[in-house]
Amino acid sequence: MQVPPRGGHGRVVSAEERRRTALPRRSTKGPLDASDIPVVVDDPLAESAPSLPSRIRSPARPEAAPQPPQPPHHGPARGIDEMPSKDLGFLQDSQAYHVLPVTNVPPPFLDAPHAPPISSPIDTLLLSGHYRLAAIAAVRNLVNAPSPQDHDTLLHLLHVRLACLCLLQEHALAAQESKVLGDLNSAFYRHPLTNAHLVPWPLRLLVVRLAALGYGEWRKGIMGYYELARECRESIVKAASDDEKALWRTRLRDCGIRVANVLVEMGDFEGAGRHLGTLAAEGNQTRQVSLMETLVWLRVGDMSSARRCLARASNTAADELVDGTLNALIQLADSHYAAAATFFRVLHEKFPDDAMVAQNLAVCLLYTGRIEDASTILSELVDESPPFHSLVLNLSTVYELCTERNREKKFALAEKLASRREGGGGVGWELSNTEFKL
């Protein structure tokens, strides 16, 4: 910068003057002027932030109002890994949810003496097996949630709602309600920088399963799992730690198992068996996949393949209860009912508290014509352990074989089970007319 000429005459500017005029005026702002700092200082994406003088990056603050230190601009700034605020108010639309049908529920369960109030905490309802009440409470809390931007709460409540509907065998209803999420592959659910997904992984898996099971769109379900598997592979490549890689590998293998599950549900047992045989696993995971293959080949009726897979699982890590049960089931599938009953009786003596073994023993006795013994075992199971679906179904079948007044006995059984305070043992409290064969 030069001094403009005055009166038509100029003078020579010395080097010292030029040096002084080239320097900008130093800032004299104090702590109270810190708010005048350009906004780019707090912008983690601003390229000029690291080059700012340290005096401006860390302005002095009044001692009476200490503030936490700002994260360094050359590292991950606060908020980059967190999901930006999204308005999920569309999940709170009461029209997206339905009144649960009660036509398939025995009357004793609708007017149970020990049913907890709907105002009970959802976790308590889930632990006690009251899935119908938990589903109702979840959607009430979801619709009345104060903040449509509370992603974690809203998505958790929706997950509880859909999972409870599945546990109540209302898959079609759950599939219909899951459509409130829209397209989970849209950019709306993605972090703009990290590409992280807003929706928790278990809920995404459930939505894919509902697309297949709720509407019978099996191919769509398989394609959905393959899409999630592609994301797993990409995340394994981008993972920064071994723990993160292990997590995504586990999810990838789980997607493969779920594909086999869809193949089983659509009746393609041979395809499911071949698919399971292609899954890569290590250690105990190899045993887990081999046991799944064993069950699939049992459904197919290929006993030699079932024995081969069971032998591979036993060589990996033997388990007397599981391996013995599968060996007995192979005998049962081969129509060797007496041998299967002997296998299960030995297991029942070693594991008297295992309800699965006791029920299978009762079924084998039923096939060998010992209906009274089978009825005794199943009746004792109902009294001593939390009743599960197949147990009630088998006992109702025995009632049909033993008496013409079986409907009265089934209804009495329903009243007895409805008088329980909770499900317990990881099973639901409510049972449907299907289990009682009403």
Regions found by a protein language model. Name each.
Residues M1-H114:
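Intrinsically disordered, low-complexity acidic/proline-rich regions
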Residues S120-T124, V160-L162, L167, V199-L210, ...:
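"A position-specific structural signal for the A-helix of alpha-solenoid helical repeats
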Residues V105-L110, N141-Q149, L181-S186, A229-E231, ...:
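Solenoid-like repeat scaffolds
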Residues S128, L168, G214-Y215, M266, ...:
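Structural motif corresponding to the intra-repeat A-B loop/turn of tetratricopeptide repeats
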Residues R307-L438:
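Structured C-terminal portions of repeat-based eukaryotic scaffold domains
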Residues L88-L157, A175-P192:
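Internal amphipathic alpha-helical repeat/solenoid segments
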